[in-house]
Design a protein with these regions (language model features):
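Long, low-complexity, Ser/Thr/Gly/Pro-rich intrinsically disordered segments that act as flexible linkers
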Residues: 96-104
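Short beta-strand micro-motifs enriched in acidic
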Residues: 44-48
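Active-site-flanking beta-strand signature of metal-NTP-handling nucleotidyl enzymes
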Residues: 2-9
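An amphipathic, aromatic/His-enriched active-site/gating alpha helix that lines ligand/cofactor pockets
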Residues: 24-40, 50-51, 60-97
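Short, surface-exposed coil-to-beta transition loops
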Residues: 3, 52-56
């Protein structure tokens, strides 16, 4: 089992807009891409000790291959408008993935 977290920062005061854009993209990718294989999802934002401008979009996959296939699907043209909508809220250079293997 793998916990795959997409981390990104948004400009001050834009968290709500960014979360709405992420929600729209999330609904589509969970319905029509390799993200259908996720075992669980959640979205977290900084609260105490973490900046409220930091967002973590988390997915749990059974295999690393399932995660890689889901990410590959995001390159399809049908997702372009959704990713472009979110892009305006992402601080350049802040986005990255962290992948953890569940051991217990």
């Amino acid at each position: 089992m793998f916990v795959c977290q997409w981390h990104l920062d948004v400009p001050y005061g834009r968290q709500g807009e960014a979360l709405r854009a992420m929600e729209a993209w999330g609904k589509e990718k969970l319905a029509s891409s390799g993200f259908r294989k996720v075992k669980g999802t959640r979205v977290m934002v900084g609260h105490i000790g973490g900046s409220p401008s930091h967002i973590v979009d988390e997915y749990v996959f059974e295999t690393l291959a399932d995660f890689e296939a889901a990410i590959a699907d995001m390159g399809e043209a049908r997702f372009r408008a959704l990713s472009d909508r979110l892009a305006e809220f992402v601080v350049p250079g802040s986005q990255h993935w962290e992948v953890f293997r569940v051991v217990g």
